Design a protein with these regions (language model features):
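Periplasmic/cell-envelope proteins involved in peptidoglycan metabolism and beta-lactam response
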Residues: 1-275, 365-375, 386, 494-495, ...
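Beta-lactam-recognizing serine transpeptidase/beta-lactamase-like catalytic domain environment
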Residues: 2-6, 77, 199-210, 251-296, ...
């Protein structure tokens, strides 16, 4: 029996009402169908986008950092792919046995690992980055759900501590933190790429969406450094520091013709990829960041200024008797009474009195102008972090005693690198040339500070100073003529100078007629009773110069072994 034919129902329910209910239900199905069609056909891009927002991820494709090479193409720093581990906390299998083993393998305390996995609101958390391959294999074999592996890059430094202060290091994000790694971070780092993907709730990539942008690897960088010279210089410096129980030391070797830095070594040093217990003493690139009063290594510059201004000649006589001299109430002394010396003799014997009397023939401005021309008091123009300017006060503030002490290296400060750089004006026939950390085959062209003739005269004086009758005969080396100046400077303590703490210097060049290299050595606080630059720093200079010239295939210019003496004339300081 039909609904409309039932007498009971027909009397109680109007026909139009039942039809209305059926119509509403039918209309509902029509609306739902239309909406479904709209979503799937007309406006599907909006909902696809919403889905992507919830499950799409942009994966970074890491760029491989460029290599750092020495001048001969040997690797100083390179990147190797290494695995890193991350997790989706809410998905991690909490098996206590597996987590304990994971903690052991990754070297993470169990409490710390547990804390990392507690925040289940996070969809990504690093567990351990840059893990050794054998460890990564064992972690993978644990098969812990919710823990995943990603490829990253880690730097390797084959030369270790010998080149650490040159190369520097990167952090876990592969960003340069020190040295060349920091200076050229942008060029070495390249540009990472990206990949847009859809991931399921387990973090697995199920689909690529959009175009992949490939990474652009960093470019390789070739330095001027010769890794063999660098290693040898570091070894000899380390030996000297340990022998004399010194606090620290530095060596700088420059190519006198191109201005290239061939070696820059410091001790103490550090291993760049093992920095767990790194101290500030190890990290400091002392050759560039530490400034000192250079002592007698400034005397050749004082004499060169006087020669250039026509106030003296190499044979001008200077009376240094009786080995002391008073300037405005302050007494300047020599270690001996040298009597009357030629200007050459002032350098050879390292007379403070002689240097003072020569400086009195000059104006403060003449000295200051030349100091500025040689880079003193200015930050070195070299692409390297931490290089400092040193200190030279404006000449208008100089008192007579200050002008006097500056003539032999007190009252101003410079880094070892600045001292080596200033001597390019002697080695390069009077031109102060730019220096560079990058390889170049071009002979440098610089700013003329001294005439060729005066530069040659200074080189002759430096050869005398490094000879048997000078203060630095231990700088002499087999097969090559050398010239240089030793320096011994008392260290400042408070407002005065220590009577027991010294810095020993030696700065020079070889071969002397046409120098190919400049070498500067500084040893800080030798404490075994020997502290003169001619005894502590000069032997390091000798060994480094001889080995470097051999490595450069420079022909010896001495036919016989030089007369290397075992005693040194005491220098004034």
């Amino acid at each position: 029996m039909r609904y409309t034919s039932s007498p009971l129902l027909a009397s109680k329910t109007p026909v139009w009402r039942s039809k209305f209910v059926v119509a509403v239900i039918a209309l509902g199905f029509v609306v739902l169908g239309a909406r479904a069609a709209y979503i799937q056909v007309v406006n599907n891009h909006f909902f696809l986008h919403q889905g992507e927002v919830r499950y799409a991820r942009t994966l970074e494709l890491p760029a491989s950092r460029g290599r750092i090479l020495d001048r001969n193409g040997l690797i100083l720093a390179s990147s190797v792919p290494v695995p890193s581990f991350w997790a989706i906390p809410e998905d991690v299998d909490r098996d206590p046995t597996k987590l304990k083993e994971l903690s052991r393998l990754l070297g993470i305390p169990l409490a710390e690992l547990t804390k990392k996995l507690e925040n289940e609101d996070k969809s990504f958390v690093w567990l351990k980055r840059q893990v050794d391959v054998d460890v990564a294999k064992k972690v993978t074999e644990l098969g812990i759900k919710g823990i995943y592996q990603r490829k990253e890059y880690r730097r390797q430094y084959p030369e270790g501590e010998a080149a650490a202060h040159v190369v520097g290091f990167t952090n876990v994000e592969d960003q340069g933190q020190e040295g060349v790694e920091l200076t050229f971070n942008k060029e070495l780092g390249g540009k990472p790429g990206s990949r847009r993907v859809i991931k399921d709730r387990l973090g697995q990539v199920v689909e690529d969406v959009g175009d992949e942008i490939p990474p652009i690897d960093g470019r390789d960088l070739q330095l001027s450094i010769d890794s063999k010279v660098q290693f040898f210089a570091y070894q000899k410096l380390r030996d000297a520091v340990l022998l004399h129980k010194a606090r620290a030391g530095s060596v700088v070797v420059l190519d006198a013709q191109t201005g290239e830095v061939l070696a820059l070594a410091n001790y103490p040093s550090y291993v760049p990829d093992k920095r767990q217990n790194l101290s500030g003493e190890q990290l400091r690139n002392r050759a560039l960041t530490d400034t000192f009063e250079p002592g007698s290594t400034m005397k050749p510059i004082t004499v060169a200024i006087a020669l250039e201004n026509g106030r003296v000649t190499p044979q001008t006589l200077i009376d240094t008797s009786p080995g002391k001299y008073t300037v405005t109430g302050s007494t300047i002394t020599d270690t001996h009474n040298y009597g009357t010396l030629t200007v050459e003799g002032v350098i050879q014997k390292s007379s403070n009195v002689g240097a003072t009397k020569i400086s009195q023939k000059l104006s403060a401005k003449e000295m200051w102008d030349t100091y500025m021309s040689l880079g003193f008091g200015q930050k070195p123009q070299i692409a390297f972090p931490g290089a400092v300017s040193g200190r030279v006060r404006p000449y208008k503030t100089w008192r007579p005693i200050e002008q006097a002490t500056m003539s032999y290296g007190y009252g101003l400060s410079a880094s070892l690198f600045q001292m080596a750089h200033s001597y390019t004006a002697f080695a390069h026939d009077g031109e102060y040339i730019p220096v560079t950390m990058q390889k170049t085959d071009q002979t440098a062209s610089g700013v003329r500070v001294f005439s060729v003739a005066n530069a040659v005269e200074i080189r002759k004086m430096l050869q005398m100073a490094a000879g048997p009758e000078g203060t630095g005969p231990k700088a002499m080396t087999v097969g090559y003529s050398v010239g240089g100046k030793s320096g011994t400077a008392r260290k400042q303590v408070g407002k005065g100078y220590s009577t027991s703490k010294y810095r020993a210097w030696f700065t020079g060049m070889a071969p002397i007629d046409k120098p190919r290299i400049i070498c500067a050595v500084m040893v800080d606080e030798p404490s075994m009773g020997v502290f003169y630059g001619g005894l502590v720093a000069a032997p390091v200079f000798s060994e480094v110069v001889q080995q470097t010239l051999r490595m450069m295939n420079v022909q010896p210019d001495l036919t016989v072994k030089p007369q290397v003496v075992t005693t040194t004339v005491e220098e004034s300081f």
